[in-house]
Amino acid sequence: MNPDNDNDSLPLLTLPEQLFLLILNPETGKLPYTFVPLFHGFVGCGIAELQLMDKVIVTKQNSQSFNNNKMLIKVIDHSKTGDTFLDYILSKLSNSFAQKGLQMATAILTISVGLNKMKRITETIAQSLIKKGFIRGTLKRSVLFKNKSIYEVIDYQAKLSVESSICKVLSTPPDYPDNCLRELIILLTFKQYEDFLIKPKLMDSLISRLYHPEQCAHIKANLRLINKNFYKEPSEVHLTNDPSVKMLSLVIGGIRNAITSE
C-alpha cells in the first residue's frame, strides 16, 4: 500500500457518488436542474466523508472570539484518500488560508468555486463512477452547439442499493443516527434542494417512485420527523451532546447556508 494513499478505508461508493447516483435520472441520463448549483451538496457530502474517515474534525472557535459557539473544520490527516474529488477537497482544506479552520458554509463555497473553475464538480464525480463501472458517460450536442454530458446507468444494482438504503430510513425513522449516519447525510442533503428545483420536486419524485400512493403522505411525515430530530439550527448545534447529530447539523446547515447564499 502506498503510505501517501490511505485508500484502504475508502468505501466502495463515497457519499458524493451516492448522492450523484440517487439524483441521476436513469431515463434521461441527466442530473436535475436547480436554481442553485448542485455542487454545494456534493462538496458538503465530500467533507462529511472526510470526517467519517477521520481526515478532518470539527472544533470550536477560539474561546476569546466574539462568538465562541462558532464551529470550524480542520484537517488532522493530510494523507491522500485515493479519490480525486475527496483529495481535492482535502488539499483545499489543508492550504495556508484554511489551516486555522473554516466554517462549514465558507469551506463549501471556497471549494465549490475553486473546483468549478478547474473542472466541473459533477464531471469529476462522474469520472470516478465511470472508472468503477457504475455509469457510462457520453457527450451530447445541444441546440446551442455546446457539448453536454449524459450518463447511462450500467450497474442498476448500485443505484437501487442507494435508493433502498434511503427507503429503509424513510420507512422506519431511527431513534438514534449512529447506525444510519451515511443514509441520513444523503437524505438530508437531498432534501435541501426541495425549494430550489424547477420541476419535478426531487424528493416528491423519489418518494412517488419508491412507495405506493397511499404511503406517500406517511413517508413525507417521516421525513419531517427525521429533519426535526437530527437537524439543529446553527444557534442550537452547540447545545446537543450527540456527536452524530452535531455532525449532521453542521454538514446540512453548511450546505443550506451555501445554497441560500447564491
UniProtKB/Swiss-Prot annotation:
> Which coarse location class applies to the principal site listed for this UniProt protein?
Golgi
What are its GO biological-process terms?
Answer: protein transport
User: Which one of the record's GO molecular function terms can you name?
Assistant: phosphatidylinositol-4-phosphate binding
Q: Where does the record say this protein resides? A: Golgi apparatus, Golgi stack membrane
Q: Which GO terms describe its cellular component?
A: Golgi cisterna membrane
> What does the record say about its membrane topology?
Peripheral membrane protein
Instruction: Give the record's keywords alphabetically.
Output: Golgi apparatus, Lipid-binding, Membrane, Protein transport, Transport
Q: Would the keyword Nucleotidyltransferase turn up in this protein's UniProt record?
A: no
Signal sequence range: none
Per its UniProt record, what InterPro entries does this chain match?
A: GPP34-like, GPP34-like_sf
Identify its protein family.
Belongs to the GOLPH3/VPS74 family.
UniProt function note: Phosphatidylinositol-4-phosphate-binding protein that links Golgi membranes to the cytoskeleton and may participate in the tensile force required for vesicle budding from the Golgi. Thereby, may play a role in Golgi membrane trafficking. May also bind to the coatomer to regulate Golgi membrane trafficking. May play a role in anterograde transport from the Golgi to the plasma membrane and regulate secretion. May be involved in vacuolar protein sorting.
- Put simply, this protein is called VPS74-like protein DDB_G0288371
Q: Which organism is it from?
A: Dictyostelium discoideum
